[in-house]
């Protein structure tokens, strides 16, 4: 059962722990060609079918030698050539060297490859101008990956760092966890679609676009259900429709004090819901629970609050549900602030900041300016969150603070 936290403010860490403890990763699997696997999560371990490299080969353009042939300190005649895809054929006469190119198989008996920059051409052959040690400039079979080794475990997110490795193993396709299906809608009579004229008291629905884009960035399958008016019957129908299609249902708006009475009644009828007041700023109103078939996350209506709670809570939830074993909790680091930061003790505060190097080369952070929960431009101006502890008050320039650099959801790395 969920605990009810409406009487107090729940710490972010507690909320995240409660959420993730309930989530079991999806088990449905798809087999896709590598070109369609970018951003997908491996469903099974990748075991190497072969050694990489598959044979001893040269790491340099140069000359393959036997170390004993160099003891007389005389030029060595060139007995032949070896290229990538065209190895040296035949016997290798004693007292000679073989011209070899990068990636070419080293001939049997080769003990070292001498780079061409450490040689001189003479009428009698090739003179070697530097000391030579056994094994130099030779890439050994299996040096990178051994046959039967687990290359990537299940739960790995496949990117341009992993997919070329699979191709190098001769693997053409991979088993991946199916995409998480997320149904998304906004609530409120005050919302209007961008491109349409605003009537008195209306605002444009930006939250749904924000969340849709972040869901796409995370590789989810998005079911966009539009704007749902403040009508209990239509809202109930929207939840039933969303629950029938999705693994996760996300709504924006309708979870703040004074807004959620009928929303809460509907959700408690359809599932098991905990409405939380989180001890964070912005983003205090947030809801999480379980409908008949799907998980539910209710985001605040203020744009910055909605984006922040998605980033801090929904992003890790989706990662675990999708089978991603890497931590989705944003990493933090300590830097000095160059700005005065206004803060009232009582809640964990996520202010938007600009992380950059100062004139002396040290990392420092400055504020983006006004930190209102409606100032969404602070995300485009900034590149990090400045994370101020719950008990902390105003911060003066030069004090140490924690920052979370934005990841790709907000244009970061």
UniProtKB/Swiss-Prot annotation:
InterPro entries per record: MoaB/Mog-like_dom_sf, MoaB/Mog_dom, MoCF_biosynth_CS, MoeA-like, MoeA_C_domain_IV, MoeA_C_domain_IV_sf, MoeA_linker/N, MoeA_linker/N_sf
GO MF entry, a single one: molybdopterin molybdotransferase activity
The family this protein is said to belong to: Belongs to the MoeA family.
BP-aspect Gene Ontology terms: Mo-molybdopterin cofactor biosynthetic process
Domain of life assignment: Bacteria
Any one GO cellular component localisation term in the record: cytosol
EC numbers, comma separated: 2.10.1.1
Cofactor: Mg(2+)
Protein name: Molybdopterin molybdenumtransferase
Enzyme class: transferase
Keyword Transit peptide among record annotations: no
Function: Catalyzes the insertion of molybdate into adenylated molybdopterin with the concomitant release of AMP.
Alphabetical UniProt keywords: Magnesium, Metal-binding, Molybdenum, Molybdenum cofactor biosynthesis, Transferase
Gene it is expressed from: moeA
Cofactor note (record): Binds 1 Mg(2+) ion per subunit.
Pathway field: Cofactor biosynthesis; molybdopterin biosynthesis
Keyword presence, Chaperone: no
Catalyzed chemical reaction(s): adenylyl-molybdopterin + molybdate = Mo-molybdopterin + AMP + H(+)
SMART domains, A to Z: MoCF_biosynth
